[in-house]
Amino acid sequence: MVITLGELIVEFVSNEIDCGLKKITTFSGPFPSGAPAIFINQASKVGAKTKIYGSIGNDIFGESLINRLKNDGVDTTDIQKLEGMSTGTAHVSYFSDKSRVFIFHIEGSAAEQVTLSNLPKEPFMLHISCASVGIDSVRKNLLDLCSYTIRNGGKICCDPNMRKELAGSPEIKKILIKVLNISGTRRTVARRLR
């Protein structure tokens, strides 16, 4: 089994190249998104048994996220649906040179509220999207979850892709280095972060 945790959001993509999110234009979406959700959805599509931990608002965006994950075979039983909070969102615009700019609306949304329950008893692969380390509730649970995974005979893999829009404090950098070193899969990246 492969498990992950982190932000569950929907994404809106500008239909206009080079708008830079600075002017009124049209967008496509909402697309189910968030690095952990994108990863786990793809893992499920290629046949892995998968599960994700995270939170959504009790709204249409959250419903579309859950439906997409469920339809693709992801175990969503431990996704919390939170009353009084909305599902997180992101807006993205692409540029002619293929770069992109993001605006995330995660702070104050359900995407910030990640709790862990019903962890598998059998060994599992824990996938960590480093973009999620910017979220307090993920960061607070992460090292304990890594220890549990290793003690339980599991493995850890990391996506070292960290969005500058989500990285803030030196604490985030320290946790990233620890997680990358624990995983053993991205030691070169961890050395570069120092």
Where are these regions (language model features)?
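Ribokinase/PfkB-type carbohydrate-kinase core domain
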Residues: M1-L5, K70, T76, S99-R194
